From Swiss-Prot:
PANTHER family registered for this protein in UniProt: GLUCOAMYLASE, TREHALASE
Gene3D superfamilies linked: 1.50.10.10, Immunoglobulins
Stored Pfam families: CBM_20 (PF00686), Glyco_hydro_15 (PF00723)
Name used for this protein in its record: Glucoamylase
Catalytic activity: Hydrolysis of terminal (1->4)-linked alpha-D-glucose residues successively from non-reducing ends of the chains with release of beta-D-glucose
Covalent S-S links between cysteines: 233-236, 245-472, 285-293
A GO term for molecular function: starch binding
Family: Belongs to the glycosyl hydrolase 15 family.
């Protein structure tokens, strides 16, 4: 007799169970639709074919279609890098229609890198210029410049695609197109990381946690990418440890200081964003890199989130265990200071990351540093290490997931009825404010949703780059800058039978000009490889035939976190919208890690919250892990 049957025999009744599951099922349904809205909206904001950004050049990511109050009709290097990293991850998980968008973006950045601007030119600081006109010309107006996070984020996005090219046989494109562009950005990071600049909110001129964190990541994965293309990055290797060393100075003992050289408290979603953009699915809960599940990052999460509890009317009356609307920082006065969609989603995403990391390592640790975070969600929390097989672990994980979902539910509540997401929503009435259809808001929705479904990006190498040097040194290093012109991409087969070719002009491949050498012409070889993407996640549809009575609902539970770790309150609701008396199907589609093996069962939840389990034995399934296979269907009958 299985553990599930023992629970059934005990007549398990969970107080409020139906309500908890109903809320989660409603959020599941909204997110499924909103993810489609977000993907479409992002493409609408990318030139030249984006429906909302007429006049933008090919591959240019426009921050928002808004042209007045405020005017965001520009392309920011930071926002573009974050958005493209999101699209690259979707592409690597099987969304192959994004190929041409990614290629066009990289081609556009070859132009942008070479545009002389108020911050300098290619080799004299120009890569730190924060924004450009959508026709790929310099913005000459007054602005907070330089901003040094952009090159790091752009490098990370391009490395992700470059690695896919290498994995799928397109070595020439990775070596001759992507690597020279990445090398420019890595050279900038190594040369300028120890100099001040404006933060991601474009307001504080100093040293910023977010900037330093993403710079460390970029140099670490940049060095590995250099090796993979048969080159090297000595400036990456010498500076990454020193950047990590400096990163430690942002820890105050109770939270992460967002910026040096600022009179504000330093509690800022800058730090939550830094944690999620340096999340590594292979990492442990390392304090040194402020991984999402680390004691430091969790303590900081509580401090930052709590700083917004009393300043927004929307958050009135909510307890410490409930999610709240989150803005940039409590002292914010822009548009009178309001919650932001991307900030509220960042609060959720960090927790989804942490849940993934705990599940992967099979335990969670509570330390003196993180105790207050856990006690707010689970009153019985105490310092110690809790195995995933323990009831305490299950209770804490369930509480954290509910807390994380609460932030996303706030976004659902204040999103427009058609799913559109602006930059902000009003702190009193929740109405959308500021720039409409903010591209970064949509990217934040997609990444939070993926992490919620345990769909994670590839490792960036944190496990070999988390050791802090004994002594910090205020250093820098010079790299190699070269102008790059992308004139064509190879014909790339991104799925088993579909060839997608980017439309370009000219001939040849890449023209690269080094600072210290004469112009050299290289030819990018057109490839007709039949390689395809093996997704890291698969959309699995569970089809169940089950005759039910009015008021009964069917849920799916199982042995993995995506199916609730056997917790009935975390079960996945099945839909009965196709149900007839002669044909009673229930179904749900769940995104699961490719290759994952697990056990599962279906349960009935009655209107009085009582639970009925299927008969033994537990069902078993292994998610497909094959070239081009991104969907699967499991057909069952209630027993």
């Amino acid at each position: 007799m299985s553990f599930r049957s023992l629970l059934a025999l005990s007549g398990l009744v969970c107080s409020g169970l139906a309500s908890v599951i109903s809320k989660r099922a409603t959020l599941d349904s909204w997110l499924s639709n909103e993810a489609t809205v977000a993907r479409t909206a992002i493409l609408n904001n990318i030139g030249a074919d984006g429906a909302w950004v007429s006049g933008a050049d090919s591959g240019i990511v426009v921050a928002s279609p808004s042209t007045d109050n405020p005017d965001y009709f520009y392309t920011w290097t930071r926002d573009s890098g974050i958005v493209l990293k999101t699209l690259v991850d979707l592409f690597r998980n099987g969304d192959t229609d994004l190929l041409s968008t990614i290629e066009h973006y990289i081609s556009s950045q070859a132009i942008i890198q070479g545009v002389s601007n108020p911050s300098g030119d290619l080799s004299s600081g120009g890569l730190g210029e924060p924004k450009f006109n959508v026709d790929e010309t310099a913005y000459a107006g007054s602005w907070g410049r330089p901003q040094r996070d952009g090159p790091a984020l752009r490098a990370t996005a391009m490395i992700g695609f470059g690695q896919w090219l290498l994995d799928n046989g397109y070595t020439s494109a990775a070596t001759e197109i992507v690597w020279p562009l990445v090398r420019n950005d890595l050279s900038y990071v190594a040369q300028y990381w120890n100099q001040t600049g404006y933060d991601l909110w474009e307001e504080v001129n100093g040293s910023s946690f977010f900037t330093i964190a993403v710079q460390h990541r970029a140099l670490v994965e940049g060095s590995a990418f250099a090796t993979a293309v048969g080159s090297s990055c000595s400036w990456c290797d010498s500076q990454a440890p020193q950047i990590l060393c400096y990163l430690q100075s942002f820890w105050t003992g109770s939270y992460i200081l967002a910026n040096f050289d600022s009179s504000r408290s330093g509690k800022d979603t800058n730090t939550l964003l830094g944690s999620i953009h340096t999340f590594d699915p292979e990492a442990g809960c390392d304090d040194s890199t402020f991984q999402p599940c680390s004691p430091r990052a969790l303590a900081n999460h509580k401090e930052v989130v709590d700083s917004f509890r009393s300043i927004y009317t929307l958050n009135d009356g909510l307890s410490d265990s409930e999610a709240v609307a989150v803005g940039r920082y409590p002292e914010d006065s822009y548009y009178n200071g309001n919650p932001w969609f991307l900030c509220t989603l960042a609060a959720a995403e960090q927790l989804y990351d942490a849940l993934y990391q705990w599940d992967k390592q099979g335990s969670l640790e509570i330390t003196d540093v993180s105790l207050d975070f856990f006690k707010a969600l689970y009153s019985g929390a105490a310092t110690g290490t809790y195995s995933s097989s323990s009831s305490t672990y299950s209770s804490i994980v369930s509480a954290v997931k509910t807390f994380a979902d609460g932030f996303v539910s706030i976004v659902e509540t204040h999103a427009a009825s058609n799913g559109s997401l602006s930059e902000q929503f009003d702190k009193s009435d929740g109405d959308e404010l500021s720039a409409r259809d903010l591209t970064w808001s949509y990217a934040a929705l997609l990444t939070a949703n993926n992490r919620r479904n345990s769909v994670v990006p590839p490792s960036w190498g944190e496990t070999s780059a988390s050791s802090v040097p004994g002594t910090c040194a205020a250093t820098s290093a010079s790299g190699t800058y070269s102008s790059v012109t992308v004139t064509s991409w190879p014909s790339i087969v991104a799925t088993g039978g579909t060839t997608t070719t980017a439309t370009t002009t000219g001939s040849g491949g890449v023209t690269s000009t080094s600072k210290t050498t004469t112009t050299a012409s290289k030819t990018s070889t057109t490839t007709s490889s039949t390689s395809c993407t093996t997704p890291t996640a698969v959309a699995v549809t569970f089809d169940l035939t089950a005759t039910t009575t009015y008021g009964e609902n069917i849920y799916l539970v199982g042995s993995i976190s995506q199916l609730g770790d056997w917790e009935t309150s975390d079960g996945i609701a099945l839909s009965a919208d196709k149900y007839t008396s002669s044909n009673p199907p229930w179904y749900v589609t769940v995104t699961l890690p490719a290759g994952e093996s697990f056990e599962y069962k279906f349960i009935r939840v009655e209107s009085d919250d009582s639970v009925e389990w299927e008969s033994d034995p537990n069902r078993e399934y292994t998610v497909p892990q094959a070239c081009g296979e991104s969907t699967a269907t499991v057909t069952d009958t209630w027993r």
